[in-house]
Amino acid sequence: MHQDRRGRRGKDDEKAAYHHGQVELLTPLVKAYGSDQAFRVCELAIQTYGGAGYLKDYPVEQYCRDSKIFSIYEGTNHIQAMDLVGRKLGQNGGKNTQAFLGDLGKFIAANSEHPVLGPP
């Protein structure tokens, strides 16, 4: 029984290391995409109001200011991008990046005939 737990623990440790590596790799991408999209949405909302979108009479001006700060918190998106390219892509000997690309390839292959996810 003791060996069984140790064997399972080894597999759990491998899974944990894999998932930790994916989180490390993808965090800068998720942060940048989310914060950039939030600002773009608010920017378009201001455009729909015309010049009045900048007035405090409408909440969209506050939303825009609030969304801009997302790209600054936890390191600006540009700093995160430099960290991704300079450090995280090659982290763990590039294994995290290779694992992600392998998973992405499997996903693409599995969904190649999907009406929405497949090729146009």
What residue spans do the PLM features occupy?
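Flavin-dependent oxidoreductase catalytic core characteristic
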Residues: 1-120
